[in-house]
Amino acid sequence: MDLSESMEVDNGTTSENLKHVQITFFSKDKDLPEIPDAVFDVPTVAECDDLNLLLNKTIQATDDAWKEKKFEFLVGETFLRTSLAEFIEEYEVETETILKIECIIGIEAPKPLHDIQAPDWVSSVQVANGHTKSTNLFSIFSTTYGGDIVIVDRKGKETKLSVNSANRILKCSGIVRTTKKVQLEGTEFIVGGENQLLTLYEIEKGALVEKIVFRGHERAVECVSVNSDATRAISGSVDTNLKVWNLDPSDEATIYEKEEEESSAKKKRKKDTRTKVPMVTIGGHRDKVSSVVWCPWKSGHAFSCSWDHTVVQWDLELAGEVSRIKGPKSFTSIDIHPTSNLLISSCTDAIPRLYDPKNRDGAMVKQSFIGHQNGWVESVKWNPVDENQFVSVSTDKTAKMWDVRSSKSSLFDIHGHEDRILCAAWNEGLIATGSADCSIKIFETS
């Protein structure tokens, strides 16, 4: 196919008036057929639609079964979003040699699904496992600075509950157990906050029932993460410590019993609510712990990040440090992909950074992602089913969906919030964001 002829028709020009550049296509995607390594002489006015047409025709010429697809194009580490001429000028691309263009299968932009008003600033948000388009069970779980819990099902129906406790600013949450029963019956989750406690709640007959209170931190609890079999939780605090908690209902070893006499009312309450102390306390950070995640490749290990500019891998059984990453700023969040094992991080600046914690040079930044404009990135979350994609949310009021193959331009910008975005989650084809504008926005991804 001669792309120059197409350009002449569209622009009313002749091939003599068009500047040209030589390009070749390639792909690292194993799901794509082999792309012919032919060199094409194309006009620099060509845009993505023109390159899509050329590439599809090229593949069809060698593969009769090929069905046309939409591609995204990368030059180096930047997505091509303009004409070749504009891209070459903006990024000062050398055109004396053949321009190599990487092809990846295109995806649709995230679609707004629900916009939920919360009673206060949204401090944490989770997307539940196993609740897909075919179910109407709850998908989104969130907490607020006012002590509220907001639960949203796939159709956007809201359930708002309150912990009804003084000084109960909630800062973090984790889903412990979900059920397929109506009215959320039997759902369990753990929350932590300003009062230095974590609490495990169960929903019974549409109401919150306090099951376990976890006592041990000396300042506000900033983060919590539940392991895959929901038997352990790890938390981090402004007190700079990590604590590991036993969630197993049959556990007796970490139950705290006060020796002094208690009122009959308190005794009655204790029949329903247990107080537990930590299994392990780990010190090692020098400032508040802002995020914790379980290690996907090593049982009994976890990662934490802190405002002391470090990410640390811990052996929880030995209560010792395994490795340490030193960052340029205070860390605000981390997430580790379950299959690639790469660690994405955010700091008190506008740049998400990628690390490989399993590599000997894991403390070195693999990539820095440039795109947020002001303030800092509050949270980053991987797409658990695609090791190339993650989302970042920022105090600049935007969320950005990234592909790790492009560090200089995001896949999509997600707008809608009117104030700082404080938290994010990505699971089951849903991105959820929570903001200081007192709203939770839910987007559907392809």
Swiss-Prot record:
Localization annotation: Nucleus, Nucleolus; Nucleus, Nucleoplasm
Main location: nucleus
Family according to the record: Belongs to the WD repeat WDR12/YTM1 family.
GO BP of this protein: maturation of 5.8S rRNA from tricistronic rRNA transcript (SSU-rRNA, 5.8S rRNA, LSU-rRNA); maturation of LSU-rRNA from tricistronic rRNA transcript (SSU-rRNA, 5.8S rRNA, LSU-rRNA)
Entry's Gene Ontology molecular function annotations: ribonucleoprotein complex binding
WD repeat residue numbers: 171-211, 216-255, 284-324, 326-365, 371-412, 416-446
Chain intervals for the UniProt region annotation (Disordered): 256-275
Record's function text: Required for maturation of ribosomal RNAs and formation of the large ribosomal subunit.
Keyword tags: Nucleus, Repeat, Ribosome biogenesis, rRNA processing, WD repeat
Protein origin, superkingdom: Eukaryota
One GO cellular component, as annotated: preribosome, large subunit precursor
Protein name from the UniProt record: Ribosome biogenesis protein WDR12 homolog
